[in-house]
C-alpha cells in the first residue's frame, strides 16, 4: 500500500539525512476460529494439468494465478469467483504478455495462460462435487484437458468461473505450481 509513497519519497524528496516515515498498521482479524478451520481435514478434490511446454511468460502467469488462489478459505454457502481472485491482469499484479484465446484467435495479452488455472480448479471442484454456479468454455479447444473440461475467464467478455461451498465445513483451496526442469 505504501510502497509507491516510500519509493517516491526516497527518490524525489529525501535529502539523505535521518528521517522517519509514518506507516499505518492495520490488524486483520481472522474470519474463522481455530475450531472452524480444524474442520478442514480431507482432500475433497484434486486435479493437475501440465504446462511444461509453455514459454516462460505463460508459465509465470500460471504460477502467479496459483499463488493468488492459494490459501483461500471458503466458508459454507460462500461463492468463489476465480476472476475476482486472480485479477486485475496487470504487470503490477504479476502478469506477463502471453498467448490467450480471443474470438477464435491466439493473441498476446497480459495474463495469457491464466485460464489453465481456472480450468484446473474447475476440474478439482467437479471431483469435490461442489456446486458450479458459473462456467464458460473457450472459443477454441485447449490442449491441457479433454474437450469440454475447460473453464475460461476473461475481462473483456465477463467470463468467470464461480462455485459455491455447498458443504457444512470450510474449504481450503491450495494452488500449487511446480516447475518442470
Language-model features: locations:
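Envelope-exposed proteins and targeting segments
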Residues: 76-78, 111, 128, 159, ...
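A structural-propensity feature for long, helix-poor, extended segments
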Residues: 140-176
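Active-site neighborhood of thiol-dependent amide/isopeptide-bond enzymes
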Residues: 104-136, 141-143
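A broadly conserved detector of short glycine/acidic/proline-rich loop/turn motifs that flank catalytic sites
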Residues: 73, 80, 86-87, 101, ...
